[in-house]
From Swiss-Prot:
It comes from the Bacteria. Signal peptide: none annotated. It comes from Buchnera aphidicola subsp. Schizaphis graminum (strain Sg). One of its GO terms (biological process) is ribosomal small subunit biogenesis. It holds the Pfam family Ribosomal_S4. The keyword Plastid does not apply. The lineage of its organism: Bacteria, Pseudomonadati, Pseudomonadota, Gammaproteobacteria, Enterobacterales. GO terms for cellular component: small ribosomal subunit. InterPro entries: Ribosomal_uS4, Ribosomal_uS4_bac-type, Ribosomal_uS4_CS, Ribosomal_uS4_N, S4_RNA-bd, S4_RNA-bd_sf. SMART domains: Ribosomal_S4, S4. Residues 96-156 form the S4 RNA-binding domain. Keywords: Ribonucleoprotein, Ribosomal protein, RNA-binding, rRNA-binding. This is Small ribosomal subunit protein uS4.
Length: 206
């Protein structure tokens, strides 16, 4: 299955929430009406079954993190085999992806842009170049921008945008050096309350 290449705002409208797929330099509210799903007759929302609600939540989270269906299922199986809450384990695995951590640290405006930086070998983990977006980051790992990539205007622009975001407790970023430390796994309370991981667990448990 190929990665989605269509209009990104259409995905946000489909899920009824900002999936942070665009740069953030303009308010997404000025670009589209999130409360209206895409399509000519998008204003009227159909009544959804329990299964449809669970499926929509899974699609929302999958698109938020930019993960394809097959990889998402692998994460769920791994989360279900681990100790603790399956839903929280799933979110932790998604948060530990290198492309997500690069985005969280502000080196990329979006997770998609962060994946490009990784594939172009602009990102290092513990001083080693890693070009795998799904690479799992562990506590105390150091993520940095490669020296030859530090003058890229898109990275500088992303860091400027990051200054406007809320500081995250589980990572520490040195903007001047363009590097950061993944201090710990994020707790559930650290992450978005708009995600209902229990619906995803119910979907895959059937």
């Amino acid at each position: 299955m190929a990665r989605y290449l269509g209009p990104k705002l259409k995905l946000s409208r489909r899920e009824g929430t900002d999936l942070f797929l665009k740069s953030g330099f303009r308010s997404i509210d000025s670009k589209c009406k999130l409360e209206h799903p895409p399509g000519q007759h998008g204003v009227r929302k159909p009544r959804l079954s329990d299964y449809a609600i669970q499926l929509r939540e899974k699609q929302k989270v999958r698109r938020l993190y930019g993960v394809l269906e097959r990889q998402f299922r692998i994460y769920y199986k791994k989360a279900s085999r681990s100790k603790g809450n399956t839903g929280e384990n799933l979110l932790q695995l998604l948060e530990r992806r290198l492309d997500n951590v690069v985005y969280r640290m502000g080196f990329g405006c979006t997770r998609s842009e962060s994946r490009q930086l990784i594939s172009h070998k602009s990102i290092k983990v513990n001083n080693n170049i890693v070009n795998i977006a799904s690479y799992q980051i562990s506590p105390n790992d150091r993520i940095s921008v490669r020296d030859k990539s530090k003058n890229q205007s898109r990275i500088k622009a992303a860091l400027e945008l990051t200054e406007q975001r809320e500081k995250l407790m589980w990572i520490e970023v040195n903007v001047t050096k363009m590097e950061g430390i993944f201090k710990r796994f994020p707790e559930r309370s650290d992450l978005s309350a708009e995600i209902n991981e229990h619906l995803i667990v119910e979907l895959y448990s059937k």
